[in-house]
């Protein structure tokens, strides 16, 4: 039975470690524009990072506060919102991240 089961990947750790790992991977992704990680972590990160980009495209104050709450870094959020204001993701309605297999 499916009582009290949360959706999403566990990634072999407890919930707090998974949350911290997604947060640090998202920060690294937005700082460096690309990261190298496992495929499973990349798939989990995609669902964490793409709403932040959608909020940045909206550009209003509520979206900015949501992004700060999710990432915890005001300067990084300001950079993301500046990129979105310059039209970095203007031509896409979703699917901002791409997972490429190496090796």
Q: What are these model-predicted stretches?
A:
Residues 21:
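Basic, ligand-binding patches in group-transfer machinery
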